[in-house]
Amino acid sequence: MRIHVVDHPLVAHKLTTLRDKRTDSPTFRRLADELVTLLAYEATRDVRTELVDIETPVTPTTGVKLSHPRPLVVPILRAGLGMLDGMVRLLPTAEVGFLGMIRNEETLKAETYATRMPEDLSGRQVYVLDPMLATGGTLVAAIRELIERGADDVTAVVLLAAPEGVEVMERELAGTPVTVVTASVDERLNENGYIVPGLGDAGDRMYGTAE
């Protein structure tokens, strides 16, 4: 597993505004969308391409296009939905799947409650969207399901990560073809499982349900 923290002044600027508790939901959604597009630029650096012959108004030439099978973008419901537009803006021809995950309050493990994606992901590049990598449990469970379906190249795009979550990912997904792209690895998790300094509950702030 590999983690890539995107170092760019626009990423830092937008992330700072997202962190600010005074930022309202409409602004939060817009900035999250913009930030995802910046992260997606880095996340797709190794997207698979193939050569194609074309003809410009001047002369024939050779260019590149995205290879088949198409990349698959999978937001984790619900907060991952708020990242979808920012990702497919760069990959408009990508296929979109959905994965619903919820924590079992008895086992404290993430469980799947809804899926909408191909059964066979062999040879597919998959981009998973989830705003926060906190404890890592949800993202590990989601990526394992994708790998079980045959995905051989998975990139997780997250706005923020906690070192505890990164450690869990590195331990549980050691040796797997997984990359995490994020705007920041923050200091720690607090006793309530929130990333510090973080930005609060991304889903609540996106959808206007934060107190």
Swiss-Prot record:
Family to which this protein belongs: Belongs to the UPRTase family.
Which function does this protein serve?
A: Catalyzes the conversion of uracil and 5-phospho-alpha-D-ribose 1-diphosphate (PRPP) to UMP and diphosphate.
Note on cofactor: Binds 1 Mg(2+) ion per subunit. The magnesium is bound as Mg-PRPP.
Reported EC number(s) for this entry are: 2.4.2.9
Cite the annotated pathway: Pyrimidine metabolism; UMP biosynthesis via salvage pathway; UMP from uracil: step 1/1
Highest taxon of the source? Bacteria
Q: How is its activity regulated?
A: Allosterically activated by GTP.
Cofactor(s) of this protein: Mg(2+)
Give the binding site residues for 5-phospho-alpha-D-ribose 1-diphosphate: R78, R103, D130, P131, M132, L133, A134, T135, G136, G137, T138, D201
Write the gene name. upp
Q: Where is uracil annotated to bind?
A: I195, G200, D201, A202
Q: Which organism is it from?
A: Streptomyces griseus subsp. griseus (strain JCM 4626 / CBS 651.72 / NBRC 13350 / KCC S-0626 / ISP 5235)
Q: Does Iron-sulfur appear among the keywords?
A: no
Q: Which UniProt keywords apply?
A: Allosteric enzyme, Glycosyltransferase, GTP-binding, Magnesium, Nucleotide-binding, Transferase
Catalytic activity annotation: UMP + diphosphate = 5-phospho-alpha-D-ribose 1-diphosphate + uracil
Protein name (Swiss-Prot/TrEMBL): Uracil phosphoribosyltransferase
Question: Which Gene Ontology BP terms does the record give?
Answer: UMP salvage; uracil salvage
Gene Ontology terms for molecular function: GTP binding; magnesium ion binding; uracil phosphoribosyltransferase activity
What PANTHER family does UniProt report for this protein, alphabetically? ADENINE PHOSPHORIBOSYLTRANSFERASE, URACIL PHOSPHORIBOSYLTRANSFERASE, CHLOROPLASTIC
Task: Kindly give the InterPro entries that the UniProt entry links to this protein.
Answer: PRibTrfase_dom, PRTase-like, Upp_B, UPRTase/APRTase, Ura_phspho_trans
What Pfam families does its record include? UPRTase
